[in-house]
Amino acid sequence: AGVGTVP
């Protein structure tokens, strides 16, 4: 989840 993150 989020920007530039997993997930």
From Swiss-Prot:
EC top class named in words: hydrolase
GO function term, MF aspect, one: aspartic-type endopeptidase activity
Practical and industrial applications: This enzyme is capable of clotting milk and thus can be used for cheese production.
Keyword Glycosyltransferase in annotation: no
Record note on pH: Optimum pH is 7 with hemoglobin as substrate.
GO biological process: proteolysis
Keywords, ordered alphabetically: Aspartyl protease, Hydrolase, Protease
Disulfide-linked positions: none
Thermal effects: Optimum temperature is between 45-50 degrees Celsius with hemoglobin as substrate. Loses 50% of its activity at 60 degrees Celsius.
Record carries keyword Ion transport: no
Family: Belongs to the peptidase A1 family.
Protein's name according to its UniProt entry: Rhizopuspepsin
Source species: Rhizopus azygosporus
